Amino acid sequence: MTSSINILLLLHPTVVTDAHSVEQIKSKIYQSHNNDINSININQQIIDRITKGVIELPNDYYDEIIYINPNDEPQYREIPISLMQLIYKLLKSNGKFKGDLPLDQNLDVLMTGFIIEEEEQEQQEQQSGLNEGTVYVWVKPIPVDEPVVTLLKKKTTNNTKKSLPLFKKLNKNDMTINVPQEIDNITNNKRKLVETKLTYFSSDDENSSDGSLSDNANEEEEDDDELIDENDLLKYNNHNNNNNNNGEQSFSDKLITPRKCELSLNGGKKRKKACKDCTCGLKELEELEVSNQQNLQDQILGKLAQSATLEAIKIEERLKQQSQKKIKFTEEDLSEIDFTVQGKTGGCGSCALGDAFRCDGCPYLGLPPFKPGEVVKLDGFGEDI
């Protein structure tokens, strides 16, 4: 019996108003899973209720979470980081979060713990019901169990004193030495050593009287003949390949090819890493996987930089538009105000209180305080002209 697939369908509040579109989305989800209604459990929720904590859902429960958002503008598809973390907890290991996802939050997605992968267009259209191009799918990675190394406790003895080394006692028979016999043995050994030195450095190693080389020289030549040049091997290999039609065995048949690395026998869940001097091609496969992952991350970072530059250009255009706007004053703003009339005040409203309360450009600077409505004469302008 196949295990059931748990799917969480997150809907934007604007989608809930159209019941026909919701049923159409559900039917497409069933079609993508071969219309096996009994093995699929779809839980339909509004995304606002989950973000506010009104509804609590079980963690590590859902195989897929599909988000439906009819808004096409990217600013209305933004998902907060708290909601990303909640979705990460709700998904099972290797679970997928797909649908109408934002395209400018890839850095937040990676920081949350997801892996961004591409999904084919046809499968994505069947599950989401949207006619868009190839999109990215957020995948919750499978946790890797780290091996636990148990350390053995060192045995401690209560005896702090160290035992002394034991020496074997010699017998009395071993202590007696036959002195003349030992002296004869020493002299014989010295004689043998001298004879070997003389034979090694004798004149036989040099050229003989006939002009022929000695036996040692001939042995050295034979050793040199045993060395094989790499180019000669290649020529010999080509020659044997040409003679294969005559039934002769080629030199390449004698070569030993290394055995290809196989998967581990413990369930086949994880393959072994390539050896240090790998020759079966497993190391190249691992390097290809790393390069593909690096290219994907570079594409994501490139799109992030592109979106940042576009946002900066928009901000500059907004500032230019604000700077081009000119402030226009009305006739009431430009009308003159008589500061001496009661009920009329200036910009600061404190001209009559004295210099301590007047502005820098006030014409009453230097004059004593006066009451509103009192006639004030300004003299001394002729001296400044």
From Swiss-Prot:
The keyword Ligase is annotated on this UniProt entry: no
Stretches the record annotates as Fe-S binding site A: 261-280
Domain writeup: The C-terminal domain binds 2 Fe-S clusters but is otherwise mostly in an intrinsically disordered conformation. The N-terminal domain has structural similarity with S-adenosyl-L-methionine-dependent methyltransferases, but does not bind S-adenosyl-L-methionine. It is required for correct assembly of the 2 Fe-S clusters.
UniProt key word Iron-sulfur: yes
Acidic residues bias locations: 217-226
A Gene Ontology biological process term: iron-sulfur cluster assembly
Upper classification of the organism: Eukaryota, Fungi, Dikarya, Ascomycota, Saccharomycotina
Cofactor requirement: [2Fe-2S] cluster; [4Fe-4S] cluster
GO cellular component: mitochondrial intermembrane space
Record region (Disordered): 200-226
Major location (coarse): cytoplasm
Chain spans, region N-terminal SAM-like domain: 1-177
Binding site for [4Fe-4S] cluster: C348, C351, C359, C362
Coiled coil feature spans: none
Encoding gene, per UniProt annotation: DRE2
Keywords recorded for this protein, A-Z: 2Fe-2S, 4Fe-4S, Cytoplasm, Iron, Iron-sulfur, Metal-binding, Mitochondrion
Protein's name according to its UniProt entry: Fe-S cluster assembly protein DRE2
Function, as annotated: Component of the cytosolic iron-sulfur (Fe-S) protein assembly (CIA) machinery required for the maturation of extramitochondrial Fe-S proteins. Part of an electron transfer chain functioning in an early step of cytosolic Fe-S biogenesis, facilitating the de novo assembly of a [4Fe-4S] cluster on the scaffold complex CFD1-NBP35. Electrons are transferred to DRE2 from NADPH via the FAD- and FMN-containing protein TAH18.
Subcellular location: Cytoplasm; Mitochondrion intermembrane space
Record InterPro entries: Anamorsin, CIAPIN1, Dre2_N
